[in-house]
Regions:
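Charged, low-complexity terminal tails
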Residues: 5, 38-39
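Intrinsically disordered, low-complexity N-terminal extensions of nucleic-acid-metabolism proteins
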Residues: 4, 21, 53-55
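Intrinsically disordered, low-complexity, charged/polar segments
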Residues: 40-59
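Short beta-strand-centered aromatic/proline hotspots
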Residues: 19-27
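Short coil-to-beta transition motif at edge beta-strands of beta-rich domains
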Residues: 1-16
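Residue-level signal for tight coil/turn positions that link beta-strands
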Residues: 28-29, 46
Length: 59
């Protein structure tokens, strides 16, 4: 389970980088709902995928 993530964080799915950057909408137990820029809303099981946190520049 990934404890360093919280709603509002931006992530990428290393198993599906074509999905683009996504913003975490919710975390419930081992399920993370992410709204990805290229593929829309996805529910990720963190037992199967380790999401990579990315930093978004506000400039």
């Amino acid at each position: 389970m990934q404890f360093d993530l919280e709603p509002g964080d931006f992530v990428i799915n290393p198993k599906n980088k074509e999905g683009g950057t996504g913003q975490i909408q919710s975390i419930i137990k081992n399920k993370i709902t992410v709204n990805f820029q290229n593929i829309g809303k996805q529910v990720i099981d963190v037992n199967n995928v380790v999401l990579e946190k990315v930093k978004i520049n506000d400039n």
